[in-house]
Amino acid sequence: MTGSDQTRAKLIDIELDESIGRSTPDVEHERAVAIFDLIEENSFQPVNDSGAGPYRLKLSLAEQRLVFAVAREDGTAVVTHILSLTPLRRIVKDYYMICESYYDAIRSSTPSHIEAIDMGRRGLHNEGSQTLMDRLSGKIDIDFDTARRLFTLVCVLHWRG
């Protein structure tokens, strides 16, 4: 990919389905950080897109499925991919539980206990990110860092929904 292609194969806007509502302050903070980081640095290219990015992404849940609605910068629809949440459900549930433990530990535990929980949290996050990359394979090309940030947003949607 040339330098010009790399600047175009990216997301410039991410929207989460707001109809699901708000969550806890900790979850909302994770959402805001993930969106900021994702827009700052990402690699995102719908497979077989004859046009060019940059892209806008709307993430939502519909009938227990994850919806990736991709549009061009001007809002023109590119593609919508609907993925089953089943392969991610256990990871998201476990990740949510370990995040609750992590947030509780931050407030009251020793640094070594917090670090141990955080290592487990990162491991689950990596597993979820890889699963998301695998599910998007052949549909949307993303790198691992982009998958990590998208997985955070999938978790936020799931926690709200």
UniProtKB/Swiss-Prot annotation:
It comes from the Bacteria. InterPro entries: UCP032146. NCBIfam families: PRK02853.1. Belongs to the UPF0262 family. This is UPF0262 protein mll6455.
